[in-house]
Amino acid sequence: MPVKIIDHVYAQYLLTQLRNRNTKGIDFRKGLVRLGRIVGYELVRYFPTREVEVETPLGKAVGIEILGLDKVIIVQILRAAMPFVEGLLKAFPQARLGVIAARRKEEGGVVDVEVFYSKIPTVEREDIVIVADPMLATGITMTRAIEEVYRVGQPGRLIVVSVIATPVGIERVLSKYPETEIFVVAIDPTLNDKAFIVPGLGDAGDRAFST
C-alpha cells in the first residue's frame, strides 16, 4: 500500500473548500488545520493495536491500545505545513516535532529546491516519521526532506502526508524511497510551467498566511 487516498467524506468536503479561490486567509488556514486532524485520524487506522482489559467504575471492559503513538515524529516543511501539522497534532499529541525550511530555485527554466534549515529530533529504528507538506507537486522538496530525515537516523516507518499530490511527485518519491507510505486527500493530474499543481489549490503558504 504505497499510496492511500483518504476518501473520508469530511476530508473531501474540506478539500473542496480549500480549492475554492474565494476561501480567504483565516478560513483557508482553519481549513488546513481541520483537514490535518482528519488526515491524522485516518493515519491512525494503519497503526497496530492490541487488546487490553481496563477497570471501569463498575467492572471490567475489553478495549484496544494503539501501538506506536509515543514513537511518532512529525517533520513539517515550512511554511504551508504549519496549520496542517497543527491539525495532525490533534491525532498525535505525543509526537516530537521536526522542521525543515526549503526554497524553490529556478534557473534556466529548471526548478530545484534548496534546504537552508533543518532541525529534526533523533530518529531511532522504532520511530514512525511523518513528513508533512500540503502539496506534493514535483516531489523535489519531499525527497530533499526525506534525505534530511535519513541524515538523522533510520526510522521503522516513513510516512508522507499531503493534501494534493501529482503522479510526478509520487513517482519521484517512490522511485528514490520505495519504502515510503504516502497518504493524500487527492491526486491531481498535472503541473503548470511554474511547477504548481493543476487544478490544485494555488500557493498553500500564501493563501494560508495572506501573503
Curated annotation (Swiss-Prot):
Cite the cofactor comment: Binds 1 Mg(2+) ion per subunit. The magnesium is bound as Mg-PRPP.
* Enzyme class, first EC level, given as a word: transferase
Q: Which UniProt keywords apply?
A: Allosteric enzyme, Glycosyltransferase, GTP-binding, Magnesium, Nucleotide-binding, Transferase
What does the record give as the reaction this protein catalyses? Answer: UMP + diphosphate = 5-phospho-alpha-D-ribose 1-diphosphate + uracil
Chain positions recorded as GTP binding sites: 30-34
User: For this UniProt entry, which residues form the secretion signal?
Assistant: none
Residues that coordinate or bind 5-phospho-alpha-D-ribose 1-diphosphate: 79, 104, 133-141, 203
- One biological process term in Gene Ontology: UMP salvage
Q: Which cofactor does it need?
A: Mg(2+)
Molecular-function GO term, any one = GTP binding
Relay the activity regulation note.
Allosterically activated by GTP.
This entry's Enzyme Commission designation comes to 2.4.2.9
**What protein family does this chain belong to?**
Belongs to the UPRTase family.
This chain's protein is named: Uracil phosphoribosyltransferase
Q: Which gene encodes it?
A: upp
